[in-house]
């Protein structure tokens, strides 16, 4: 997302940009992801950066039924608390936030994409991958069946299912770091060509 880069730390110093509140972060990333398709008329404009209203099912599928009503409100509150929780292990927080986005689907559309952007933001903000160069969403694109299986495991709510999801997320971050290293080597070697 366009806003994501503005929240990343300065690589040459100790300055840290002011971070948005968890609700503002969710809204901004959702606006970045869904805004263009709303402008094209594919999604109602009032669905952009706003949680789904009670009684409205998400358009996109996911692992099992999405919560609604009070259950949706409670899970969304838990998600925002998790994003803002200080001192949580970076990998576990990123995995849980992503898992909640895919499982709860708090928005009408764009939940998985926002979840993947949140991973990138959180691992950078929390120092797991402080450069912000990693592209952990590559793994989901390359291995969609494994992504779906891991999401279903998380949605099961079992200990083993959640562990499987965290392991999948760790693999995704590792693949994203390897992809970033390959891009950096290409740039350093001067082997990129425009257009």
Task: State the predicted function of each range.
Residues 1-195:
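FIC/Doc superfamily catalytic core
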